[in-house]
């Protein structure tokens, strides 16, 4: 077994105090996202999306956040993917943003609701044409005999859609994750990290400090 117990660092970039917390967690998330972008983090919108299968086995993957507001967090995916099939059976998910360079994490629990076709199409039309074509090519999570199979299909579809717009695939969609709780974690000195949990209660949010 490889021993990694000596890998550690101190957290020095500041704390998080209750007096600084807004009543609405989405305001704090917006501030932290802005600061993550300003810090030029690699892929600040990358989040881990966790789902479970029918046996209770959890699965995680990195997905890009595409939009957020007071209603929740939006991402897009192939509707034949493992994540989409698992969401169809159990729409309870968790999201996690690991902003290690600025010593912050955000963890979200909620329910994923499918977006309307109009909402999906609006976003799909903003994607680069090659990305639109790629959505047609990949049967996400299916087994491939070789990468060349995928590349061959890509160039085939690229030729097919050389002229005009690329239509929205019927098997491509998106989700709005409506949060029931949002936890903000800020690294602290001596491992005395600051953790605050927002829990939705009716029309307001309960705020609790958690032990690190």
Swiss-Prot record:
Record has DNA damage as a keyword: no
Binding positions (substrate): 8-11, 66, 123, 127, 131, 191-193
Originating organism: Shewanella oneidensis (strain ATCC 700550 / JCM 31522 / CIP 106686 / LMG 19005 / NCIMB 14063 / MR-1)
InterPro entries: Pyridox_Oxase, Pyridox_Oxase_CS, Pyridox_Oxase_N, Pyridoxamine_oxidase_dimer_C, Split_barrel_FMN-bd
GO molecular function, one term: pyridoxamine phosphate oxidase activity
Record's protein name: Pyridoxine/pyridoxamine 5'-phosphate oxidase
Cofactor dependency: FMN
Role summary: Catalyzes the oxidation of either pyridoxine 5'-phosphate (PNP) or pyridoxamine 5'-phosphate (PMP) into pyridoxal 5'-phosphate (PLP).
Protein's UniProt keywords contain Transmembrane: no
Pfam family, one: PNPOx_N
Reaction(s) catalysed (UniProt annotation): pyridoxamine 5'-phosphate + O2 + H2O = pyridoxal 5'-phosphate + H2O2 + NH4(+); pyridoxine 5'-phosphate + O2 = pyridoxal 5'-phosphate + H2O2
Cofactor: record remark: Binds 1 FMN per subunit.
Family (UniProt): Belongs to the pyridoxamine 5'-phosphate oxidase family.
EC number: 1.4.3.5
Summary of subunit composition and partner proteins: Homodimer.
Keyword annotations from UniProtKB, A to Z: Flavoprotein, FMN, Oxidoreductase, Pyridoxine biosynthesis
GO biological process entries: pyridoxal phosphate biosynthetic process; pyridoxine biosynthetic process
Pathway(s) this gene product operates in, as recorded in its UniProt entry: Cofactor metabolism; pyridoxal 5'-phosphate salvage; pyridoxal 5'-phosphate from pyridoxamine 5'-phosphate: step 1/1; Cofactor metabolism; pyridoxal 5'-phosphate salvage; pyridoxal 5'-phosphate from pyridoxine 5'-phosphate: step 1/1
Binding sites annotated in the UniProt record for FMN: 61-66, 76-77, 82-83, 105, 140-141, 185, 195
């Amino acid at each position: 077994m490889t021993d990694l117990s000596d890998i550690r660092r101190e957290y020095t970039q500041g704390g998080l105090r209750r007096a600084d917390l807004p009543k609405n967690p989405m305001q704090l998330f917006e501030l932290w996202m802005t600061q993550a972008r300003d810090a030029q983090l690699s892929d600040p919108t990358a989040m881990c999306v966790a789902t479970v299968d029918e046996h209770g086995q959890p699965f995680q993957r990195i997905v890009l956040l595409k939009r957020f507001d007071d209603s929740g967090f939006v991402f897009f995916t192939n509707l034949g993917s493992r994540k989409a099939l698992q969401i169809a059976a159990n729409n309870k998910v968790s999201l996690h943003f690991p902003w290690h360079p600025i010593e912050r994490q955000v963890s979200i629990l909620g329910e994923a609701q499918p977006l309307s076709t109009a909402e999906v199409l609006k976003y799909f039309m903003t994607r680069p044409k090659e990305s639109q074509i790629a959505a047609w090519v990949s049967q996400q999570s299916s087994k491939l005999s070789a990468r060349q199979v995928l590349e061959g299909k890509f160039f085939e579809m690229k030729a097919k859609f050389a002229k005009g717009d690329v239509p929205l695939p019927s098997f491509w969609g998106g989700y709005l994750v409506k949060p029931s709780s949002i936890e903000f974690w800020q690294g602290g000195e001596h491992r005395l990290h600051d953790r605050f949990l927002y829990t939705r209660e009716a029309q307001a949010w309960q705020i609790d400090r958690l032990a690190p």
